[in-house]
Amino acid sequence: MKRIIISTLVLCGLCIAAAAQGNATLEQLRANMSNKSAAISYSCTLTSSGVKTLGEGTLTTQDKSYVMKGNGLRIYCNGTNLWVVDDSSKEILIDSVSQGADAYLSNPVLLLADLNSIFTIAQPVKTGNSIVYKLSPKQSCGISSGTVTISVAGPNPVFTSGSFKMSDGGQLDIKIKSMTYSEKKPLTFYVLDLSGFDSSWMITDLR
C-alpha cells in the first residue's frame, strides 16, 4: 500500500516540478496542486517476485496530508500522525510520521514538496497527444526509476498513467481513472475520529 501511495503522489507531484522547469502546458495543473485539494481515482498492478496483485482506490491530498482508500484499507495522515484502518479485521494502527529518510515512506506527501531535490526529471518526450516524463532518484525514497504519461488531447492536460520500478525489485503500474480539484478541506478531514469505534475494535497506538 505504501508503494501505491508513493507512486501515485509522485505522479501528481511531477506537475509541480515540470512547471517549475518552465513547462507551460502543466502550469494549470501546478496551480491546482498547489492551491486546492486533489481527488484521484486509480487502478494499479503490483508485480513482486513474479506475483501480480491488482488494486484500485481513491486518494485525496493537500499540503502534507492525505486520505487513501483501497485494497481493504483506509489510511489517514495529517502530516504528523498516521492512522491505518482495516475494516474487515476491525483493527486500527496509529503511528507518528517518521523522520529523516523514512519520512517519505510513512508520509509520501512529503515527496511533493521535495520532488526537485529527490528526483532528476528528464526532458519530456511527446508522442501524439501524450507527453512522457522519465525520472530517477537522487536519494533513497522507495523508487529506483519511473515514467509518467500525461495526455494533452483535451483543453486541459491530465495524468493518465505511471510506471515505477521499486527499490525492492517490484514493479508498480498505475492508471489514473479521474483527477479533480476542489477547495481545500478542513484539516480534520485528514484525522481519524476514534469516537465512532466501540470496544470491539483493536486499536494499537505506537506513538
Regions found by a protein language model. Name each.
Residues 1-8:
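Bacterial N-terminal signal peptides that target proteins for export
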Residues 5, 16-52, 64-65, 196-207:
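N-terminal leader/targeting segments and the immediate start of mature chains
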Residues 31, 56-61, 74-75, 120-126:
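Short, exposed beta-strand/loop patches in secreted or surface proteins that constitute
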Residues 42-46, 67-71, 132-140, 161-165:
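Short beta-strand segments that buttress and anchor functional surface loops
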Residues 58-105, 169-172:
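An acidic-aromatic
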Residues 97-130:
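Flexible, surface-exposed loop/linker segments and immediately adjacent secondary-structure boundaries
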Residues 127-131, 139-145, 154-207:
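Non-transmembrane domains of secretory- and envelope-associated proteins
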